[in-house]
């Protein structure tokens, strides 16, 4: 316990690389000097090298990841796979080699009756040892042994590999400035000069300044490869100013393959990514080392977050909030990087962003529920049964983009909290409270975990205004109250909003009950003409308040979401279809996302297949452009002329389905 703070640093400790590399060099030199190739512990590819590989990862990451602080080599190799620091096949190769080397070691010691790891040189002893280990002869034993040692040697060569080729200065400072002269204007040169002459840089320790000078030529080399080098460099300078105060980040850039190139590419592609990293430089490590070849599944995200939450104590609310925030931010950044580099399909990106939110929500509810139950116990259900931790009488419902599985990079979460507890009965813990108080505190605690603003930002903005009675209503509603409100008091626009809802997490019974209520409300018999008129009137109000101004429209500006022919028109048509047609076609309530809703309407014969396909294509194109603009930090406006065909397709269907009197679009 006394040595732990010295062995395991609190954050990822890249500064130990130089020491580890030196230690590795000492091991290699000792092998050559002492000619210990026949020593299966100290020789090349031996037991010591496997242990060194494990200890390298423990020293670098063990301060932040408690599960890596074990002493069993084989268990730690498995943990390195769980922590995604080693690939499964790498760990398996090392484990197999370790077990075989230990078998050989035990055979040597049993035959010699002494503590030695030296292979026998006498042919008689060699033959005997081969027989003991189950081999036909010494040659067969050595073939297997050398294969295992070669595997170990390869992994040993890769760990903290000599980066002199990476860390060498590509050019001296004058040569770098010459390269920059060709791409920087006068203002750019002044900003670079101001950076290098800043008081902040002057105050840096000499070691940190030298690291910055090592990073700089590689950074410029990468910057010169992108389309807009000056803009990219101006985005990177604020990040360098932030991270040079903790030179461990500079070491990380020097130590990670391709880290500088990825950082430059992402900064060139998205000012949003650059600004996120400037605001939260702690994300840099995860961002530059995360896998972006494939988008993660929800199961992978959940397992990752579970592992991270195991690093903090159950009572450490601040630590839990920090992990939720940084997990969300780092995973969203990874999706953005994957999106930009691999041009992911829109729906795959939205799925990934939605899964991140779901995993964070599920964890927040789990943490909040466990904390409350430990203090107050569990409430009773409305039917008198006792709720359980695995099946609480509480659920979180997602509305809007979360409900529709259509989250973007900056989306907030529209949430409604529902319960099925006996509001008057007390919980069964040492400090009992009423069921209603329990649910209110649970919802508030979930909100706290998600929305508390700290130096690391917040996990999500949360909007609960869509709950029954809006701001005037209770933060948590019972299933009974929710049903009564939807049946007797809700406006049509609230039923529209119900189209894009789904249960996110909580007790299975409550989630199933919500699904049933949603289905029954959406399939109520309605006058299609009245629905059409209310949808038209609501959409007109939105356009007047949120759409482009008259002058902007005359200037040929098209707002992708709010103007005629935009995303909201398509969403309103889908919602109209559910409200007007699901009474006769109850399967239209199966899904909450627009793409599958339109497909179901075509299947039911409510829309022609060609109309549904046209709306789907327009919807995906327009939403994909909003994602691109969000990453570029640009407004959601485009040239009306360039989007003329798409707008006309949507507007023609709007006229046919909702508003025959709608004015034609300006060509």
Where are these regions (language model features)?
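A nucleotide- and high-energy phosphate-metabolite-utilizing enzyme signature
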Residues: 1-667
